[in-house]
Amino acid sequence: MAAATRGCRPWGSLLGLLGLVSAAAAAWDLASLRCTLGAFCECDFRPDLPGLECDLAQHLAGQHLAKALVVKALKAFVRDPAPTKPLVLSLHGWTGTGKSYVSSLLAHYLFQGGLRSPRVHHFSPVLHFPHPSHIERYKKDLKSWVQGNLTACGRSLFLFDEMDKMPPGLMEVLRPFLGSSWVVYGTNYRKAIFIFIRWLLKLGHHGRAPPRRSGALPPAPAAPRPALRAQRAGPAGPGAKG
């Protein structure tokens, strides 16, 4: 039922479709009522994992292992009412492997409003950290942005694009947020999601990128290690929304 409301569904009879729409409308009314009576919705966090699986299966060619790992990690994280770490996902590969598409799907199926949700923060080095000489200010701003938004809502998603272009040392400020401590800087961050996207531009012997094997994941980049491991730990940038 949840998948139907997000647009990924098998088509059935008209009668079945009308019944599905009616059921979805009733469920939406109930959810809206619960949202007004308490903290049921946890900000904009409304995960639709069946819809995500459906969309990945229909529109992401190859990368079978990657799809399985992402869905498995999300299921375990979402179903845990009290996770001990934030969810940290690393999406890395060559152009055309679906990294950006997968990250947009994750935002779409986890948060109402998708990338436009105020709880989804999309960082681009070109837009938000263009001058390496300003690294100390960037560190201060990034730490403040993450801390402030997690204080406002623990269910937040932080998406870092083009990690290979980030100023050296900037991501070190995130290390405290990616561990297993209960509180960092007075903020509970264990329900947050961090996604790191890295483009691999390594060329082969003939000046071309190595061929992509179906279901194969490229080797993980070297640093920063806590940020670039797919693990169960886990802005637009400071001053902007995704």
From Swiss-Prot:
Predominant location: secreted
Positions with biased composition (Low complexity): 225-235
Known tissue expression: Isoform 4 is ubiquitously expressed, with high level in vascular endothelial cells and vascular smooth muscle cells.
Cellular component terms (Gene Ontology): cytoplasm; endomembrane system; extracellular region; intracellular membrane-bounded organelle
InterPro entries, sorted: P-loop_NTPase, Torsin
Pro-sequence residue ranges: 27-189
Residues carrying covalently attached carbohydrate according to the record: N149
This protein's record includes keyword Transport: no
Modification after translation (UniProt): Amidation of salusin-alpha(29-Gly) by peptidylglycine alpha-amidating monooxygenase, PAM, converts Lys-241-Gly-242 to Lys-241-NH2 and gives raise to salusin-alpha.
Pfam families linked: Torsin
Alphabetized SUPFAM superfamilies for the sequence: P-loop containing nucleoside triphosphate hydrolases
GO terms, molecular function: ATP binding; ATP hydrolysis activity; hormone activity
Keyword annotations: Amidation, ATP-binding, Cleavage on pair of basic residues, Glycoprotein, Hormone, Nucleotide-binding, Secreted, Signal
UniProt keyword Lipid biosynthesis, yes or no: no
Coiled coil: none
N-terminal signal peptide: 1-26
Ligand binding (ATP): G93, W94, T95, G96, T97, G98, K99, S100
Localization annotation: Secreted
Start and end residues of each stretch annotated as Disordered: 210-242
Residue numbers of Lysine amide PTMs: K241
Function: Salusins -alpha and -beta may be endocrine and/or paracrine factors able to increase intracellular calcium concentrations and induce cell mitogenesis. Salusins may also be potent hypotensive peptides.
Family as reported in the entry's similarity comment: Belongs to the ClpA/ClpB family. Torsin subfamily.
Annotated protein name in UniProt: Prosalusin
